[in-house]
Amino acid sequence: MAPKKKSNDRAIQAKGSEAEQLIEDYLVSQYKPFSVNDIVQNLHNKVTKTTATKALENLVNEKRIVSKTFGKIIIYSCNEQDTALPSNIDPSQFDFETVLQLRNDLIELERDKSTAKDALDSVTKEPENEDLLTIIENEENELKKIESKLQSLQDDWDPANDEIVKRIMSEDTLLQKEITKRSKICKNLIATIKDSVCPKNMNEFLEEIGFEDI
């Protein structure tokens, strides 16, 4: 049985003059401009970006291809070919700058198309006009139920309950103050016992004399 290929085996990538010839042949076959990233991607990583960049630089220096810089991006294309065009076609429509402009226009159109599609998807997610009436009606009914429940609570409320609530809150405040006061006294007492008696285990000592955890 033949040994299985390891999944992490990498395809052999072109380098040096082989990479230059591969890229030049590709640009000639496509006869349109590309960035280095496009070339690497379209060649399915047969060359690395570093190798492709060096190969393109050599090809330009040897005048085997041409390049043009747009901002931070360098676009590469094969040298202009003597292509036989139909008599009704203006050759000026196929020079480097025109093709590049058309390519940029296409990118813009694709971007506009994507934006329009996102807007359409957003609109289609909204409910239909007929459904809006039902949704509004349901929301109004829910609001009426809440208002009815609130009114019922207000009608059943006994003013005397206000005094009861206030008294409970006042007593709770006094109780919390008393708890805080007694807790402080207890802690001071424990500190005094600790300094005076100096037990080996304070927790066991407190448990023996009946103190609970504070």
Swiss-Prot record:
Molecular function (Gene Ontology), one example: double-stranded DNA binding
A single Gene Ontology CC term: DNA recombinase auxiliary factor complex
One Pfam family recorded for the sequence: TBPIP
Keywords: Coiled coil, DNA recombination, DNA-binding, Meiosis, Nucleus
Coiled coil: 97-160
Location in the cell: Nucleus
Lineage top rank: taxon: Eukaryota
Biological process, per Gene Ontology: homologous chromosome pairing at meiosis; meiotic joint molecule formation; meiotic strand invasion involved in reciprocal meiotic recombination; reciprocal meiotic recombination
Main location: nucleus
Record has Ribosomal protein as a keyword: no
Function: Required for proper homologous chromosome pairing and efficient cross-over and intragenic recombination during meiosis. Stimulates DMC1-dependent homologous strand assimilation required for the resolution of meiotic double-strand breaks.
Family: Belongs to the HOP2 family.
Assembly notes: Heterodimer with MND1. MND1-HOP2 binds preferentially to dsDNA.
Protein name (record): Homologous-pairing protein 2
Name of the encoding gene: HOP2
